Amino acid sequence: MSQIKPSRLSSSAEIRGARQLDVLQRHKLAEPQQDWLAEEVPVALVYNGISHVVMMATPKDLAAFALGFSLSEGIISSPQEIYSIEMTPGCNGIEVNIELSSRRFAGLKERRRAMAGRTGCGVCGIEQLDDIFRPITPLPFTQAFNLEHLDTALAQLKQVQPVGQLTGCTHAAAWINPEGELLGGCEDVGRHVALDKLLGIRAKQPWQQGAVLVSSRASYEMVQKTAMCGAEILFAVSAATTLAVEVAERCNLTLVGFSKPGRATVYTHPQRIK
C-alpha cells in the first residue's frame, strides 16, 4: 500500500496542492501580482477496475483519502482489506486505483452507487433516501476530554494547513490527544475529503485516545464518518446541523460545536467532556 504520513508544514516552494497565478489586485490602484490558489481537481476512486465515485479534492494525501473513504463509507472494515493503492494522473484529473479483497469487492458491487460529487459532497447520486443513513454500532464510552486542553489544539490547527495558510481556501481535520496535542492532520478544499484523509492516516497510526477536530461546520455526514471509524468525540470550529445532532445522539458520539478558545457548545453526550 502507498505509504501514508501526516501532513507537515513546509516552505511555500514545496507545498503541494497550491499554485501561483497572475492576478490583478485592486485596492485604490490596480496592481498586477502573483497570488497562491488552492488546487481543486476531479479525483476518481476506482475499486478493482470499476469507478465508484468522483470527488473534487486537493491533490495531496490521496492514498490517505482512499483508505479513509473506504473505511468511513463501510466499504472495508480494516486497512488489510485493501491490497494496493496506485495513482494515475490524467488530463482531466486523477484516478486512484484501489485493489480490494475479493470478499469486500463483492459486497461493494451489491450496494454500488454512482456518484459525481461537488466539492466535498458525499451524497450526490444516491438513488434512495434509505441509502443515506448507514447502520452504525453505538460507540462505547471509553474516552474523555478536558476542555482546558482545547485551546492548545486550536492553536496548532494551522500547522496542518500549509495550503490554507497560503490561500485561505482549505478545511482542516486533525487528531488530538487528551492533552490537546495535535498528532496529525490533513487539509482539503472539501471538508468531507479532509476528514476522510485524516481517518485514513489514523487507521495506520497507533492513535486510540483522543478526538477529531475539524475547522468546518459539522454536518450529519461528518458525524457519520467519524463514528464509522470508531472515534467518540468530534470537535467542530463552526456549528452543527440538526441532523448531525440527531445522528450523534443515536450513535453515542459526543458532538461539540463552536469550538473556540475558552468556549464550546456540547450538543450530545456531554459525559465525555470535563
UniProtKB/Swiss-Prot annotation:
It comes from the Bacteria. GO terms for biological process: Mo-molybdopterin cofactor biosynthetic process. It is found in: Cytoplasm. Pfam families: FdhD-NarQ. The active site is at 121 (cysteine persulfide intermediate). Keywords: Cytoplasm, Molybdenum cofactor biosynthesis. HAMAP family: FdhD. Required for formate dehydrogenase (FDH) activity. Acts as a sulfur carrier protein that transfers sulfur from IscS to the molybdenum cofactor prior to its insertion into FDH. This is Sulfur carrier protein FdhD. The lineage of its organism: Bacteria, Pseudomonadati, Pseudomonadota, Gammaproteobacteria, Enterobacterales.
